[in-house]
Amino acid sequence: MKTIKYILGLITAILFLSSCDEHVYEDSSWHAWRPGMVYCTNGEVMSYEDCAKQGNTPEAILFYVDNQGVISGKAYAVSLKNYSEKEFIDPDTIYFEQGTSADIEAYDGEVNTIALRYFQVASPIAKNVSPKYFIPSVAEMYKLYMAKSIVNSIIKQCGGELLPIDKEDCWYWTSTECAEAPQDRAWRYSLTSGRFEAADKHSLFATRPIISIRLNKEE
């Protein structure tokens, strides 16, 4: 009888442990995320009102949330400030390809920025950006362009540097080289018009870095 009780107890314990192993806490708060919410320095995402109420420090503003799995379940947030004008390629070097995809439809700014930062000669715009951030691709800049109005309203509340959406001569570097001339041309982007143009890599333009946040989509 003792043996049977021992075996039954052992089986119960195993089943209990198995159920614990299979239960993983999933944070489903991302379901409520939307453009205009604040990414805080502690990693939390919330409305500006909640951020201020809780005494958190805003770091970036969400401008796209991939609820449909279009870009592998990511959210994008844009920095509260511009980064200073720099060249795409070191002006003291000759022109050469820098290892980006050159794909204007790809959401690969992070990969592109890594290539620019760690290529044989580091790109000035990549070196200028905090390692936590990356320079958006053409496709990612388009997402920012589409959300610029709501993003700017929250940037203003956070005391950040507004996106220049009414300046025709204001351009930002993307991290995408031009497929037709990757050695000496890369794409610049206007948040005023949503237009992008090829530019000489030795040209000076600002960057507006972004971060990506992986959504917890397993629940």
Segments predicted by a language model, with ranges:
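Short, ordered beta-strand-loop transition motifs
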Residues: 8, 67-70, 179-181
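Sec-dependent bacterial lipoprotein signal peptides
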Residues: 1-18
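An exposed tryptophan-centered "aromatic clamp" motif
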Residues: 113-134, 138-191
